[in-house]
Every structure is written in structure tokens, then in C-alpha cells.
């Protein structure tokens, strides 16, 4: 799998997001555009919003465009639907549960088969959950020191209202579909829709 190896703090600063959004408990004290960059064009703004979402969720261009295509066919606003598609990825759900420190880590634990959806093992990070799905950890993994340490590190992470989580039991239930109002970062997804619509 291709990985963007640019320094995370540098990317966060460029995209104007807090490192905590991607699970890094560090802050960059230099504000984005602190070096006095020239005014960004409309295309530049659209491209930056796309880069922001791809970076946050660790999704490459081809699957990202596929999510856009799905979003345009769903009811409602395509931009909001795009957020829904990304937030309901299994690797993101594991991250939101606090069962992984970063989304990159969550992709790894999903790939290694540590989690079940409705009692069935799912090892595909891009698997999309739906309302009513119950995500649990395998019994064999539940007693792992690794996951107990992860929960200690992510203890202060807020679990979104669309997930009904029980950290003691390592479980979560999807009680609603997430939307743009549920994310912990600022984004203008309509700019991405405009970019792809050209």
C-alpha cells in the first residue's frame, strides 16, 4: 500500500489542521501560511480541501474518487455524503473508538484481523459499517496488553455521538450515520465536489 511519508506535523500545518485530528498528541506552534504565501486561487482552495481529507483518512486518489462517486448517488448533499463515506470506514471507526492511536495504526490492527463486525471477522480497513452494526474485538485480542496500553493513551479521546461505545468491553454500535457536524476538523467538502464536477 502506498504511504505518504511527508512529516506529519508539516502536513498538518500546511493543511491547517491540528495534529490531534490524526491522533498525534503534539501541536505545531507555527500557524499555517505563517510565511506569507500568496493568495490561493479557487482551484488551489479546492485542491487543498481534497488533500486535507485524503491525508486525514489516509486514502489515495483512486479510492477517494470512488467515494465521491458514491456520495453523488446518495440522497442529500454530495459533500456531506463524502464525509459519511469516509467516517464509516472500519479503520476510522476503530480510531474513533480509541482502539488505535492513529488511523494508520487502526488500518494495521484491522488488517491483522483483531476486530469483528456483527460477530464476523473483517480484515478490510475500507469496509463500510452501517447503522446497527456492532464492532467488537476478538476474544483472543481482548486480553492483549497492547490494546490496554492503547486505551490508556487514547483515554481522553471523545467518542462521536453516532457511536455507542463501551471501552471496558471493547465494543461499539453504530447508532446513526455520521455527517459533517460530527467531525473534529474544519472542512469545506462542497469545494471538493466543485473540483470533481469540472
How would you label these PLM feature ranges?
Residues 1-97, 124-198:
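Ferredoxin-like alpha/beta domains used as RNA- or RNAP-binding modules
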Residues 105-107, 194:
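Short, hydrophobic/aromatic-rich beta-strand segments within well-structured domains
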Residues 96, 111-112:
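The C-terminal cap of the DNA-recognition helix in HTH/winged-HTH DNA-binding domains
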Residues 109-110, 129:
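Short, well-ordered loop/turn sites that connect or cap secondary structure elements
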